[in-house]
Amino acid sequence: MNEDSSIAELEAFLEEYPDTRFMDVFAADINGIIRGKRIPREDFSKPFEKGANFCASAALLNSRGEAAENHPHGAHDGDPDIRSVAVPGSLATVPWASVPTAQCLLELQEFDGKPFFGDPRNVL
C-alpha cells in the first residue's frame, strides 16, 4: 500500500469514527508478544505517512521481557529507534476501551525502508 492509500484508509476511518482520541499501535516481537504504545490523535497520521519511530529493542526482547545484548539494537548503543508503518487493513476500533480508541498493527523497517530483521512479519 502506498502512502496515499494509507492516508485514505486513516481518513475514511476517522470519518466513520470522528470521536477517536487514541490509537494503540503495536508490533509482534521475536517471540510473538505484542509490544506497542498509545498515541494521541495529533500523531495518528505518522504510521500512515512516513512512519513513526519505534524502539528497536522492544522487538528483540526475550520471552521474559529482558533485553539481549548480542544484537545491534540495545542499551549498549543508545537503544536506537527504527521506523514503523501501518499494516494496510489493520486499523480498527477498540470496542472495549473506556474512551474512543483505535488500534493498528505495525510493520517494522529500517529508516531506509528495508525490512527490520527483528520483525517476525518480515521472516514469513
Which role does the model predict for each range below?
Residues M1-L124:
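ATP/Mg2+-dependent ligation/transfer catalytic cores
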